[in-house]
Amino acid sequence: QVERPDDWLKYGNPWEIVRPQHAQKVSLYGRVLHSCDDLGDYRPQWVDTKQVEGIPYDLAIVGYGAQTVNFLRLWEAKASEQLDLQVFNQGGYVEAVREKAMGESISKVLYPNDETERGKELRLVQQYFFVACSLQDMISRFQRTDDDWNAFPEKVVVQLNDTHPAVAILELMRIFLDVELISWDKAWNLVRRTFAYTNHTLLPEALETWGEALFEKVLPRHIEIVREINRRFVAEELKNRWPDDEQRIREMSIVG
């Protein structure tokens, strides 16, 4: 079998309704500044990032014989800057739209081939882009009617089907910690109550793993959260249950 592109939106889609007013900004790459606030609490800053815009499209889902219409919200990636006019005026016509092409490649093909390093990077970027857009959208909807984060898990439930959207756990932790300034223990409690997970296979080739260097390059703040989750998991769970079994602890550690 040979895979070929299907330009199914060539003539538009009457069932998809674009919602540019609900676009979301997604940060990628960059670095983390380690700083504390006036009270001495750790307040890292994710800076020098590349920005990508997520444009939502709503697909109406109508139940048979029902009076309710739900919407499946899909996301299209757009570069935050469509044209670098300074580069264009200097004669760099191709380079001037490079950011536009790179941004739009994120949502061009679902699950890009990850046999190359660039393919792995694009797949990680794509997975993060979709969950970041969706979580920001969920939070903005929640905040329209509620300002009590304790009620968040009662109003919002996220089902993770397989490993592809698992980075959503880290993104919600980042939002709670860095944006909403919630303490770690409270944020982790909210996250654990918000997410449900279904694993569809135990085959090693189907369970995703990411190199630390790649993850740190694309999502530098999120790798810090992974390491802290792992540190607490090892100290509070594994070493309490198997204090003398170092081999088991290494095998069950999130970070290799």
Please annotate each region the language model reported.
Residues 1-256:
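A conserved ligand/cofactor-binding region detector
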